[in-house]
């Protein structure tokens, strides 16, 4: 028994005629007849009764057909799945991201990326250190984090962005085109907790103004929410700030403080067209939305 014989049997059962089955398989009618005879010999079953120009499936043929049809449905499913994977329409994608991205930017992008219904995606919002661990352990295919760009065992792409100053709507500083370290005066500064690379960069660049009355928070979104409620001002990463751009004022800072992020993959990870496409499209989406919002040029 071979697959071609099974295909011939299926074609005859589907069409009910040898001639139509031959057309379906793009072979001659004698070739179909020969394949059916060989299949009957291999199975030791009489599958069809010949009545003139007509063939009638036997009960044995009907019983066998149920299994053959199930098998071909399974093969078709495998074929369709392989085609979907080739078109990057199916597969799995596990993303780990720091909260500044996981709480706003990535959901925006995923809403349009997930138009492929067979793509299984998980998004984990984690501190940057845990993002790196998730990628290293294989729990995430790609990660977005803050941290040093030189790390062994990772493939890292850096995305540099200038920090901005977030102030309440109608605040005196909102009227400025650019804010210098001296201009906050006695304003309450909302700063991110010590320990993150971004917080360290801010401390190094403008440590003197951080000695003024301040609030300390762990998340960019918390700082931005406090700014919106006029509890103070904050030096913030624009990726998080975009979610608040209609409820606060964002102004460039005169000193460049890198508020970018890293795209991280494992150096030992298997290549994936789905991950490659996600990374490329997210990068384009991020840059386009930031430029459209006027937060970067």
From Swiss-Prot:
GO terms for biological process: positive regulation of gene expression. Residues 18-37 bind DNA. Residues 1-58 form the HTH lysR-type domain. Keywords: Activator, DNA-binding, Transcription, Transcription regulation. GO terms for molecular function: DNA-binding transcription factor activity; sequence-specific DNA binding. Signal peptide: none annotated. SUPFAM superfamilies: Periplasmic binding protein-like II (SSF53850), Winged helix' DNA-binding domain (SSF46785). InterPro entries: LysR_subst-bd, OccR_PBP2, Tscrpt_reg_HTH_LysR, WH-like_DNA-bd_sf, WH_DNA-bd_sf. Belongs to the LysR transcriptional regulatory family. Positive regulatory protein for the occ operon involved in octopine catabolism and uptake. Also acts as a negative regulator of its expression. This is Octopine catabolism/uptake operon regulatory protein OccR. The gene is occR.
């Amino acid at each position: 028994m071979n697959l071609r014989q099974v295909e011939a049997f299926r074609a005859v059962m589907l069409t009910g005629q040898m001639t139509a089955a031959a057309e379906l398989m793009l072979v001659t009618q004698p070739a179909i007849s020969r394949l059916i005879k060989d299949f009957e010999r291999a199975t030791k079953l009489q599958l069809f009764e010949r009545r003139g120009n007509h063939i009638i499936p036997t009960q044995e043929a009907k019983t066998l057909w149920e299994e053959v049809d199930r098998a071909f449905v399974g093969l078709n499913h495998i074929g369709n799945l392989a085609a979907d994977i080739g078109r990057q329409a199916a597969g799995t994608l596990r993303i780990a991201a720091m909260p500044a991205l996981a709480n706003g930017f990535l959901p925006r992008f995923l809403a349009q990326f997930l138009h492929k219904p067979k793509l299984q995606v998980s998004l984990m919002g984690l501190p940057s250190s845990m993002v790196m661990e998730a990628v290293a352990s294989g729990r995430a295919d790609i990660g977005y984090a803050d941290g040093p760009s030189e790390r062994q065992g990772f493939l890292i792409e850096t995305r540099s962005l200038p920090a901005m100053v977030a102030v309440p709507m109608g605040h005196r500083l909102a009227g400025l085109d650019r804010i210098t370290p001296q201009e906050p005066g006695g304003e309450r500064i909302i700063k991110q907790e010590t320990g993150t690379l971004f917080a360290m960069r801010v401390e190094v660049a403008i440590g003197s103004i951080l000695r003024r009355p301040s609030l300390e928070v762990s998340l960019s979104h918390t700082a931005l929410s406090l700014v919106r409620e006029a509890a103070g001002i904050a030096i913030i990463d624009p990726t998080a700030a975009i979610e608040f751009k209609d409820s606060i004022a964002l102004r460039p800072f005169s000193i460049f403080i890198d508020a970018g992020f890293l795209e991280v993959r494992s150096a030992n990870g298997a290549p994936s067209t789905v991950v490659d496409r996600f990374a490329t499209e997210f990068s384009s989406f991020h840059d386009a939305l930031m430029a459209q919002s006027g937060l970067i040029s």
